[in-house]
């Protein structure tokens, strides 16, 4: 009898824990750039557009809205600036979504007043705080975590102080096997592609630079 009661108690606990775990997903036009102060990666994101939460604490994501905008015979890719969205976790699954943008007019309206919706699986709206993330430095996407940390330390509208961390600038690199410490990176070029090549070349160690130069000579 004791064993049966213990088994039932364990089963109830497991059921309670399992029901508490929620999945945060996005609409097809929204991508996660950062989750709770960390850059979104395969270790954080279960699939392309989802991750798990197991508490009702405050959470924060940085998202980007992307749409193919068709106008006449041309199609253009729209990608929004990073948007910080802070919300309270729930025991339900959550979806983060953005309106469908079909025209340049929709895009301009969204740029002026971006609205990211957060709802539970049952359709209840989750209160949020959201605003654009200020982007600083060369290749701001590379400095996303640093920019987000500075934002969270600033006490801004959607900031979460506990997600502010002290980080070295990405351009400084790290030391260790196969790595070299980097100082200030200076780039020049006619276009973004050329500047990016210069940036990453200067970030690489000597062996990688040599391999790249040998490859480039063969092209």
Curated annotation (Swiss-Prot):
Keywords: Signal. InterPro entries: UPF0319. Residues 1-21 form the signal peptide. Belongs to the UPF0319 family. This is UPF0319 protein MS0844. It comes from Mannheimia succiniciproducens (strain KCTC 0769BP / MBEL55E).
